[in-house]
């Protein structure tokens, strides 16, 4: 029954639908792109290990990453987490930050955005320049 409500090509998991977009955009443009897809659609927020694993599986089967030779070409993938002006990490969909999988314990000193780290097979998050262009994941609740 989870399938109901997901747009064709999107992956259902635990009441949400996930879509991977290979086009490379800055964090802000990626978030705007997601929002244009639907009222409740944003860059993905991740709240537990199971959700994170589901996203990793989706990326593993997504076109740009299915061929290991191509992996370096695309690199990291944007998620909806960024350092706000108040110096707090916040999800773009407004949900609570209640889970983390940071690549290293570096707290950035300036505005920054989080991406899934490709060298860690997307199992960890790293801090990136928000202006960097990367593929991204959008999500919405069903």
Swiss-Prot record:
Pfam families: Lectin_C. Disulfide bonds join 6-17, 34-138, 113-130. Its main location: secreted. It is found in: Secreted, Extracellular space, Extracellular matrix. Residues 13-139 form the C-type lectin domain. The keyword Transferase does not apply. The modification Phosphoserine is found at residues 62, 68. A minor form with some unmodified Ser-68 and partial phosphorylation of Ser-66 may also occur. The keyword Disulfide bond applies. GO terms for cellular component: extracellular region. GO terms for molecular function: carbohydrate binding. Gene3D superfamilies: Mannose-Binding Protein A, subunit A. Coiled coil: none annotated. Keywords: Disulfide bond, Extracellular matrix, Lectin, Phosphoprotein, Secreted. This is Dromaiocalcin-2. It comes from Dromaius novaehollandiae (Emu).
